[in-house]
């Protein structure tokens, strides 16, 4: 799935816990990248651990300072995004035309972005949340989630 060169990354979020909703479906850690025409969930990336950690810490700092977290990150453009998409089949690309609905739900533990996808007359539901803290043993799982206003992403989708 090739991206057009005129697309622009609107938001790049780190520490995302997301995937398909449903019985016996395990979500994964990844990055959520939003362009003008697509929502992309990247679980396998060419980004080094050190660079990923730096951008994750910057995002955490923006949360603490109550600043806008829906920003692209420096040094990560369309070329890097294309390379990451091609790296693994587990990296998921949803065009806005495939998305039938996008909204967010405020829960006790955090805010979750819900996305309904229509692929070949089948509807699938996905959920994404920004992680605040992790537990690493016995398996890496999220411990806490951020309460986020997902309106900038939902508005971008509805205006497209």
Residue ranges and their predicted role:
Residues 30-34:
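Broad, structure-driven detector of short, well-ordered beta-strand segments within folded domains
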Residues 37-38:
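Structural motif
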